[in-house]
A protein has these predicted regions:
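Low-acidity, Ser/Thr- and Arg-rich intrinsically disordered low-complexity segments
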Residues: 2, 6-17, 21-27
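Short, surface-exposed alpha-helical recognition segments that flank or form part
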Residues: 9, 23, 46-50, 206
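Intrinsic-disorder-associated, low-complexity terminal segments enriched in Asp/Asn/His/Tyr and depleted
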Residues: 22, 26-32, 36-38
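Helical scaffold of the NTase/Pol beta-like nucleotidyltransferase catalytic core
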Residues: 39-72
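Conserved NTP/Mg2+-binding pocket subregion across the NTase superfamily
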Residues: 41-47, 110-223
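Conserved nucleotidyltransferase catalytic core and NTase-mimicking acidic/glycine-rich helix/loop elements
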Residues: 49, 181-307
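Catalytic metal-binding acidic patch
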Residues: 74-109, 125-140
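Short, solvent-exposed loop/turn segments at secondary-structure junctions
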Residues: 78, 143-145, 252-254
């Protein structure tokens, strides 16, 4: 039996009879280790209906599921930055109890997780499906949790959770960010009026402090030992943490890391990573350059936000 990454059977989420898939997207007790659906090729079967009819069809089916109070379109397609092969990201907002078996019963091809099947926390599960030839992700959103995190964000309070594919993790105010930028397709969902002033201060300070600590640890421990991989990893994490700090200082919502460095004006960090060397002195210098660039970006964002 192959098992990647390591975990215990009790941590896995049963999805189909005879197989068990860990929230990371890898399979246990199956002949092969299958990758997460996001790593699979884009379906080649041509769509049978145009995009608007497809969206109407999927929305109607999701909205009819027991407990669902609203459906929203997210990701690049909600923000107008998508390409022709981009996934369709949909969120179903439920109140009280939602049973993933009701979604499975629709009969769409793909994998449907249980509640909490993506590691628990605010990103509490969903499905990777193929509908009419289109890769379609469905995210579960508990309205009670959404309202709780919205109230906390207004007070400047939040926490950060790990999530697969995210180097910096995700802030709990992600749920509020989604409501701010996503396109509501049906239902009466809460919409934040603006980026909370207290959150701008607290989130920027938290993310910047985390980035500085990440670089400081790498400079004190990994760089002197010539550990290039660890230094590069710390630098990448710190850059994305700083991206969160910059956008928080500006009062701009973030829903994922895909374009975070571009939006924060930090794509130039690539040149520092590209110039990495194995010698300890060179690695220490590389981290120092990165620290200066990241600190300057946060200072500029805070200055512009204060004007």
């Amino acid at each position: 039996m192959r098992f990647t990454p390591a975990s215990s059977p009790s941590e896995a989420t049963s999805l189909t009879r005879g197989t068990v898939r860990h929230p990371s997207g890898y399979w246990l007790d199956s002949p092969d280790t299958r990758p997460h659906p996001h790593l699979m090729p884009t379906p080649t079967r041509p769509p049978h209906i145009d995009d608007e009819k497809f969206l109407d069809h999927v929305t109607d089916r999701l909205a009819a599921l027991p407990g669902v109070r609203g459906v929203a379109l997210g990701g690049s397609r909600a923000q107008g930055t998508h390409g022709p092969d981009s996934d369709w990201d949909l969120a179903i907002y439920y109140r009280g109890v939602f049973d993933p078996d009701d979604l499975r019963a629709v009969g769409w091809q793909g994998e449907v997780s249980g509640i909490g099947g993506w590691g628990g926390g605010v990103f509490n599960g969903g499905a990777w499906l193929t509908v009419e030839g289109r890769r379609t992700d469905v995210h579960y959103r508990d309205l009670d949790v959404v309202e709780r995190e919205s109230a906390r964000a207004e007070q400047g309070r939040f926490h950060v959770e790990p999530l697969l594919f995210h180097l910096a993790g995700i802030p709990s105010y992600l749920l509020v960010a989604e409501l701010a930028v996503n396109r509501v397709l049906c239902g009466d969902l809460p919409r934040p009026a603006a980026y909370p002033a207290r959150l701008r201060v607290s989130a920027s300070a938290h993310w910047h402090g985390t980035a500085r600590a990440t670089l400081a640890y790498a400079k004190a421990n990994h760089a002197p030992a010539g550990r290039l991989t660890e230094v590069a990893g710390a630098l990448a994490s710190a850059a994305l943490q700083t991206g969160h700090a910059v956008l928080a200082a500006r009062g701009e919502w973030v829903t994922n890391e895909k374009r975070l460095l571009e939006r924060a004006g930090l794509r130039g960090i690539d040149e520092i990573v590209r110039g990495g060397v194995n010698e300890p002195e060179g690695l220490v210098h590389m981290l120092g350059r990165a620290e200066a660039v990241l600190d300057a970006a946060v200072a500029e964002a805070r200055q512009s936000g204060a004007e």
